[in-house]
């Protein structure tokens, strides 16, 4: 699927603000209800603009969905990059001690109440080729940020995608069972990473017992 850039590029500051507000509105709707809920009318209502404005700035819903998906992905990448910055500012021992919290903060929304909607909308992304395209493209930055944490901790033979898959898998299973996504992901991260770090001499034997709590 090819998503072309809209031909209606805003020229004035006011127009740029209006267009940006439409992207933000679409991104919010997508996070709350999934791509299928993003329509010209729903986005205009959310952004408090004229219904015709959405069609003016975007050639199609696919164009809008792509930009909304890109907006969401960049937001998640910035969150992960901020956590990676924090990890690199720590001394190595502190970074290793807090590795579970760092991975969790980089991979999941901080607000525990948004975990279920977050993962439901990720699963719903398959409804739109434009959204999956945006998410695939944006994954590079997210992977790079997780990779920086892995490198700072000193973990060997671990990829960012493994960490993300572990967290996401734990979260989705918890959501499906009506349990805390953050708690399940935290427990599974601790169950995996602490034994690996002790095995590789990155952590004292006594540290990380009891799921890292």
Predicted regions and their residues:
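Hydrophobic/aromatic-rich alpha-helical bundle segments in the mid-to-C-terminal region
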Residues: 131-136, 140, 151-213
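Hydrophobic alpha-helical connector segments
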Residues: 80-114, 163, 186
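Solvent-exposed, amphipathic alpha-helical segments
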Residues: 21, 25-33, 79-82, 86, ...
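Amphipathic alpha-helical segments within well-ordered protein domains
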Residues: 81, 104, 122-123, 147-151
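N-terminal intrinsically disordered/low-complexity leader segments
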Residues: 1-17, 201-213
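Short, basic, alpha-helical segments at the C-terminal edge of helix-turn-helix-like DNA-binding modules
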Residues: 70-77
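Amphipathic alpha-helical segments used for helix-helix packing
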Residues: 108-132, 139
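Helix-turn-helix
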Residues: 21, 25-67
């Amino acid at each position: 699927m090819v998503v072309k850039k809209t031909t209606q590029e805003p020229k004035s500051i006011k127009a740029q603000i209006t267009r940006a507000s439409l992207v933000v509105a679409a991104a919010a709707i997508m996070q709350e209800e999934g791509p299928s809920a993003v329509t010209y009318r729903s986005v205009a209502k959310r952004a408090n603009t004229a219904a015709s404005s959405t069609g003016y700035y975007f050639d199609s819903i696919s164009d809008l969905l792509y930009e909304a998906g890109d907006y969401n992905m960049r937001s998640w990448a910035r969150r992960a990059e901020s956590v990676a910055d924090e990890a690199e500012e720590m001394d190595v021992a502190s970074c290793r001690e807090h590795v579970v919290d760092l991975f969790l903060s980089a991979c999941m929304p901080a607000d525990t109440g948004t975990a279920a909607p977050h993962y439901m909308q990720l699963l719903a992304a398959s409804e739109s080729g434009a959204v999956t395209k945006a998410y695939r493209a944006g994954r590079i930055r997210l992977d790079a940020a997780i990779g920086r944490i892995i490198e700072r901790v000193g973990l060997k033979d671990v990829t960012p995608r493994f960490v993300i898959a572990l967290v996401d898998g734990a979260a989705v299973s918890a959501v499906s069972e009506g349990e805390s996504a953050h708690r399940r992901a935290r427990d599974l991260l601790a169950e995996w990473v602490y034994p690996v770090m002790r095995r590789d001499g990155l952590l004292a034997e006594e540290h990380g017992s009891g799921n890292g709590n």
